[in-house]
Swiss-Prot record:
<dbReference type="GO" id="GO:0051537">
    <property type="term" value="F:2 iron, 2 sulfur cluster binding"/>
</dbReference>
<dbReference type="GO" id="GO:0046872">
    <property type="term" value="F:metal ion binding"/>
</dbReference>
<dbReference type="GO" id="GO:0006915">
    <property type="term" value="P:apoptotic process"/>
</dbReference>
<dbReference type="InterPro" id="IPR007785">
    <property type="entry name" value="Anamorsin"/>
</dbReference>
<feature type="binding site">
    <location>
        <position position="278"/>
    </location>
    <ligand>
        <name>[4Fe-4S] cluster</name>
    </ligand>
</feature>
<feature type="binding site">
    <location>
        <position position="247"/>
    </location>
    <ligand>
        <name>[2Fe-2S] cluster</name>
    </ligand>
</feature>
<feature type="short sequence motif" description="Cx2C motif 2">
    <location>
        <begin position="286"/>
        <end position="289"/>
    </location>
</feature>
<dbReference type="GO" id="GO:0030097">
    <property type="term" value="P:hemopoiesis"/>
</dbReference>
<dbReference type="GO" id="GO:0043066">
    <property type="term" value="P:negative regulation of apoptotic process"/>
</dbReference>
<feature type="binding site">
    <location>
        <position position="250"/>
    </location>
    <ligand>
        <name>[2Fe-2S] cluster</name>
    </ligand>
</feature>
<feature type="region of interest" description="Fe-S binding site B">
    <location>
        <begin position="275"/>
        <end position="289"/>
    </location>
</feature>
<dbReference type="Pfam" id="PF20922">
    <property type="entry name" value="Anamorsin_N"/>
</dbReference>
<feature type="short sequence motif" description="Cx2C motif 1">
    <location>
        <begin position="275"/>
        <end position="278"/>
    </location>
</feature>
<protein>
    <recommendedName>
        <fullName>Anamorsin</fullName>
    </recommendedName>
</protein>
<keyword id="KW-0408">Iron</keyword>
<dbReference type="GO" id="GO:0005634">
    <property type="term" value="C:nucleus"/>
</dbReference>
<feature type="binding site">
    <location>
        <position position="236"/>
    </location>
    <ligand>
        <name>[2Fe-2S] cluster</name>
    </ligand>
</feature>
Amino acid sequence: MADLGVKAGDKVLLVWSQPSSPTTLKELAESLGAMVGTDGRVSLENMERLMMSSHAASSYDWVLSSVLSDSFSVHTSETLAEMARVIKPDGKLVLEEPVTGTDDQKVRTAEKLISALKLSGLVSVTEVSKEPLTPEAVSALKTYTGFQGNTLSRVRMSASKPNFEVGSSSQLKLSFGKKTSKPVDKPVLDPNAARAWTLSANDMDDDDVDLVDSDALLDADDFKKPDASSLKAPSCGDGTTKKKKACKNCSCGLAEESEQESKGAKTISQPKSACGSCYLGDAFRCASCPYIGMPAFKPGEKIVLANTGLNDA
């Protein structure tokens, strides 16, 4: 245990589990006591009674769990959380646990053990060593857990508690004052770059500069007024077997022609009076008069009849 880094004045919690030899446990406790000296302390705790103990939070510099060669234990998430609770900030946890090479409900893999340590709030989780279990330990583990696999090994993990307490708070210094920004220097304009984009009047009068005459761009045909038929697209209203249909955003006049045709088709010729006295009222109208039931109107006034009335007439 000398390679762990336990020094004088440290407080160590040694967690042991069955089966453990009392002699081996006593020798390890005495060895740790000699390391920490009179200013330190070594406490012993059984794994099964750890959750029922009343250890103060953040009271140990070290927690050593199942590090005896003749013992083993599968650490639950509750046990790992309790160990993380009693460790001081920046304290260390060293544990040993049997792992398997394949996923199993009884014994987990080394990767899952690392994940469980991180979920308990510990950091800097590293795998220190890994060695095969002795036949006696394998037999005892199968009896204890019911595991029936053969890919078993013993792994030692090291982890640290963060240098702050869980749930601790710290005041943040925030400044909401308006910050004065330094004046930004205006970039200096390159005279060569400005000269490249400048065209002077002298350059316009230069004989080497070819200017295009705008009047020469049009010929005599461009000034002729186009015929309406020439403006129509080849496919505009095309087809003799189908009705002419104007294109979208038509500009050739076909849309106006179609609109006039549709208005003319909707015009209904109103029946004309034969007696000339229909406008006076029902008293002066014939029995088959289409204006029966309508009020009197002025001569020449436009009257629109319903389709039902025309059908009945």
